[in-house]
Amino acid sequence: MKAVRYHSYGGSDVLVYEEAGRPVPGVGQVVVQVAGTSYNDADSGLRAGLRQDMLPLALPHIPGLDLAGVITALGEGVSEWRVGDAVVALLPADAPGAAAEYVAVSAEALATAPHTVGLADAAALPLVGLTAWQALFEHADLKPGQSILINGAGSAVGGYAVQLAAQAGAIVTATAGARSRDRVRSYGADRIVDYAVTPVVQALAGQHFDVVLQLAPAGPEENAHLVDLVADGGAFVSVTTPGPQDAGRGVRAVHVFGRSDAAQLTELVARVDAGELVIEVAERLPLADLATVHARAAGRFARIAELAARAEGGVLAERLRADPAAVRAPAAAGELVGKTVLTP
């Protein structure tokens, strides 16, 4: 089968579109013919080896955390799925990914794919949708009537977060630029702050929110200012760089990494099919173009990585110093904007 793989950690140039062995299902697994996968900045982090101390990969590695496709084979012990079922899943980061024609995946990770959108487009849902859900309802414990600031609402996670928070009955203030402002408003935001006109902290000076959800890359100083916007007893939840606790005011600071959860993904799919949740796809490309997609995201990813290294220090900072080309490769023409779906 055809797949994109990398045989060593590094920049986008280590990604190779090549022949790879077709997987067979293990016990409790199914094989899925991939209809689509999508790019996430986490894919660049794994490719660059930034977390190899915590999450070493067996090389060569097939990337692609998001999966949408059709089951073609069942492993021993799988009874709840059938060949021909259309499914979506968030794959383990250290397992072979969906940037291939076929992938083996645990049956327990699967959810039935939405039937109201194209199957390939459904690959834009798992990681970012689950991250938004878990940030809001597991970590922030968002309740109806609470106020929330979503910083970076124009991002892929932000789009889902605005929709879910509004549907939960929260009062949503969202930051967005001119490019995404109308879309974010259509998702249910009660108020839009244009960060390009006035810095967020300045625009919201003196206001407080039960929850601040940080989706934009930021350094420790900016995160500290955002924590100041959290009401006493509230939560600062970040999916980018961590923020400081404010124990004196009872403010919790949580750093979120999205994880696979089939039940939550099933709920997200149900909302898509009910017309309550919009899957936004900015671009559709052939899988062979994945290296170009990584290159187009290089500028944004480099900033995220460098800010994370400033915030965390330690091994991550050392790794960036040792191999700066892994994250600072020149971006290709045309910066990556929105969610990109890739099809074999």
Where are these predicted regions, by residue range?
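Residues located in well-ordered beta-strands
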Residues: K2, V16, Q33, A68-V70, ...
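N-terminal glycine-rich beta->alpha transition that marks the start or flank
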Residues: G10-V14, E19-A68, W81
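Mid-domain Rossmann-like dinucleotide-binding core that forms the NAD(H)/NADP(H) cofactor-binding site
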Residues: L125-D194
